[in-house]
Regions:
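Conserved C-terminal guanine-recognition region of P-loop GTPase G domains, centered on the G4
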Residues: 1-34, 175-177, 199-241
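Conserved G1/Walker A P-loop phosphate-binding module
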Residues: 74-212, 216
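Conserved P-loop NTPase architecture
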Residues: 1-133
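Conserved Rossmann-like nucleotide-cofactor binding loop
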Residues: 41, 170, 221
Length: 241
């Protein structure tokens, strides 16, 4: 791989699995390119898509939870600065300081999201006894487009992965039956557990739904894999099917 990178003047290598901080550091030093693993790439996409305070808070929490166990490995100069037996070099002291800062920030973000969760619970209670239908599906499958057609409204739509991070709820009247339709974040294969935890308040909309409407793009060559990925994610977030 290193030879291929050098011969083709590549400056970025993306792994479809997660790497430890140490693995990332070793590969970057060996190949002289930036290394991005699967979760890091997904988090970067989420960060670029986050439009509201809630989404930005959820993404930041997931980023910090991803970063915390990788701090040691990401310090490329740590081994050279390590102190002797029973001592700590300056690199290790800085890592401990960074860990405390990250843990404190994680704690603050969790408290902030707890308040958001309570607000979301209050909002759901305020919707009355209407039947709740939640659109689920693989990312970029067309859930928001379907929401716009059914509700005759303009939910943000873009042909990009994870264009929707926040939950949108619309009241729909089908014949004589009114119901609430929600559009949530799209699922993906091997959904990082940091995102599941951070986006709890968003995914709760799926938990609370009376009906799950699984949207599938059968024109996609891998639509069967997408169905499997969505069903697997539902199991991971403990949603009964």
């Amino acid at each position: 791989i290193g030879k291929y990178i050098e011969e083709h003047d590549i400056d970025l290598a993306i792994f479809d699995d997660d790497l430890t901080g140490k693995q990332t550091n070793i590969l970057e030093e060996e190949w002289k390119v930036k290394i991005v693993d699967r979760t890091s790439l997904i988090l970067d996409i989420f960060a670029a898509r986050a439009q509201t305070a809630q989404a930005r808070t959820q993404v930041e929490l997931a980023q910090l939870q991803y970063l915390l166990p990788r701090l040691r490995g990401l310090w490329s100069h740590l081994e050279r600065q390590r102190g002797g037996i029973g001592m700590r070099g300056p690199g290790e002291q800085e890592i401990e300081t960074d860990r405390r800062i990250v843990r404190d920030k994680i704690s603050l973000l969790k408290k902030k999201l707890e308040k958001i969760d309570q607000q979301s619970i209050t909002q759901r209670k305020g919707r009355g006894e209407l039947i709740r239908v939640s659109l689920i599906g693989y990312t970029n499958v067309g859930k928001s487009t379907l929401m716009n057609v059914l509700s005759k409204s303009e939910v943000f739509v873009e042909n990009k992965l994870f264009a929707t991070l926040d939950t949108t709820v619309r009241k729909i009247v089908f014949g004589t039956m009114p119901f609430l339709l929600s559009d949530t974040v799209g699922f993906i294969r091997k959904l990082p557990h940091h995102l599941v935890e951070s986006f709890k308040s968003t995914l709760d909309e799926v938990h609370e739904a009376d009906i799950l409407l699984h949207v599938v793009d059968i024109s996609h060559p891998q639509y069967e894999d997408h169905i499997t990925a969505v069903n697997q994610t539902l199991l991971e977030i403990k949603v009964e099917q």
